[in-house]
Amino acid sequence: METTTVKEISILKNGHVTSPSGFYAGGVHCGLRRKKLDLGWIYSDTPASAAGVYTQNTFQAAPLLITKHTIEHSKQIQSIIVNSANANSFTGKQGYEDALLMQKLVANQLNIEQHHVAVASTGVIGERLPMDKVRNGIRQLSHTQVDAESFEKAILTTDTSTKHVAVQVEIDGKLVTIGGAAKGSGMIHPNMATMLSFITTDANVNQDSLQQALRKVTDQSYNQITVDGDSSTNDMVLVLANGRAENNELNESHPEWSVFMDAWNIVAIELAKMIARDGEGATKLIEVIVKGASTNQQASQIAKAVISSNLVKTAIYGNDANWGRIIGAIGYSGVPVEASKLSIAIGGIQVVNNGEPIDFDEKDCKQALNQETVNIVIDLQSGMDTATAWGCDLTYDYIRINASYRT
């Protein structure tokens, strides 16, 4: 398989959740959507150590509650079932029973334990799942199918593209693979998990270490993106590690733990950037880099304030280097900043230096902003810490898409 190497970590061309050994996936159309695939699954040929992080939204959806309880008690997952078009959220007691039935049906279909099945849903909130359709879809599940592309399509809602990546790295002389898939286009905001993302790896990883590591990875990737400032009731990130690579068990004291974490971070950050780039109606990926901060938390706080600003996002859409909007966002971020030390560059063009405005050519700046990726670099010159956040521009199409979401 053709690869691109970054240090000792290889990024696979066209990598998927099925790239790690022992993982299978597929997707079918069961009738939740008019024509598109709407029910997907991941299966491991052996129970995998599992970890999850979940939305902080008060109204957590039934599938999320069941998955969270399952992982907390069993510590292992062998299959994940995901439906799109219907969130099964705010659907009362019956919605919970429907999600529980999905878990049971998958376990029966794949001949595995019910407490080894995770359930996820995404789509319209407040509508009951048509369980007859879901039941018929689950009957098509197979534990021998390797069709990650169908899985990636089945979990989408307003996304315009699938999101997937995989990397390989050698640990203990064994080739370890980490794959990932995600969905997310709207209702994306830094808040614990922020969308649906599924990570698979054939690494042998201690479950407690896996859970702690997932929180750290999430903070550096998914929690650093925003599209529209809304956080869904269903958002979660799940990771499965089935140990098929047969490396020595990984934990924080393993000599190559940092190598594993670096590889995992690449997967998570790439997926996060794909989500931000595919924001509803978006035409550009915006990357905000804050450096020279006293702490990483302060750098992250400022980066997220700027990337979440609708005024900044609309200015970028209009190719307008209105750096005053960036100043405004920094000012309300809650982080104390010395104005006399502040420097800002937009698209590589310096607009503020040591607290003073810099004359710049508007045409050059418009050209720099008229790119698929726009970088904003903010230098606080107050320390050594840095953070990066990702988002997208805000366009007329965002309103069009969300004004007719249910039609």
Curated annotation (Swiss-Prot):
Keyword check for Transferase: yes
Family annotation (CDD domains): OAT
Entry binding sites for substrate: T157, K183, T194, E280, N402, T407
Enzyme Commission identifier(s): 2.3.1.35, 2.3.1.1
Gene Ontology MF term list: glutamate N-acetyltransferase activity; L-glutamate N-acetyltransferase activity
Location of this chain's protein in the cell: Cytoplasm
Keywords, comma-separated and alphabetical: Acyltransferase, Amino-acid biosynthesis, Arginine biosynthesis, Autocatalytic cleavage, Cytoplasm, Multifunctional enzyme, Transferase
Protein name: Arginine biosynthesis bifunctional protein ArgJ
Organism this protein belongs to: Oceanobacillus iheyensis (strain DSM 14371 / CIP 107618 / JCM 11309 / KCTC 3954 / HTE831)
Gene: argJ
